Amino acid sequence: MNEKIRWLRNKIKSINLDAMIVSNPINITYLTGLKEEGILILGRKENFFITDGRYVEAVNSKLTIEDEIIVEDIRDLSQEDRENLFLFCENVGFEEHYVTYSKYKEYMYKYKINNLVETEKIIEKQRAIKDEEEIKNITKACNITDDCFEY
C-alpha cells in the first residue's frame, strides 16, 4: 500500500472512523496519483476507486498491486454492492469543505451510512507537508520558470 494511503488509513483509525469517502479530485490525486474522475473509498479492509466505465482501463493501467485499490465501474455496482461497501462501519468520514449538502444526502441514501463525520481537512493539512519527491518537483518547476525568465 502506498505511504499516503497508509497514513490516511492510520489517521482515520486514530479519530475513530471506520471508513472514509474522498471525493475531492486534488486529494485523490495526492493520495493515488490518479487524475481520472471518481471517488476513493477507504473501507474497513479494502480501498475502492469508483469511476465511470470509460476510465476503468486507464485507472487499472496506472495502479499496481502494491496500491491495493480495487477499481469498480459505477454502473456495475448494484444497490446491495453500494451498501456492502460500508457494512459494519459506524462512522464514515467525508470532506465537509468539498461535499455539498445534496451530495451528503446522496451518500447517506446510496451507501446506507448511519453516521457521516466531518474530517476537518485532514488530507489538506497533510498535503501542506512536502516529502522529498514533492520538494524535488517544486525545485525543478522553479528552475524551469527561472530559465524561462532568463531567456
Segments predicted by a language model, with ranges:
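Compact, glycine/acidic-enriched structural inserts
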Residues: 51-80
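Residues that cap or initiate secondary-structure elements
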Residues: 46, 55, 98-100
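Flexible, acidic/His-enriched mid-domain "rim/lid" segments that flank
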Residues: 3-5, 76-151
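Terminal domain-start leader segments
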Residues: 1-50, 57, 86-89, 109-114, ...
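Fold-independent oxyanion-binding glycine-rich loops
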Residues: 23-25, 52-53, 96-97, 121
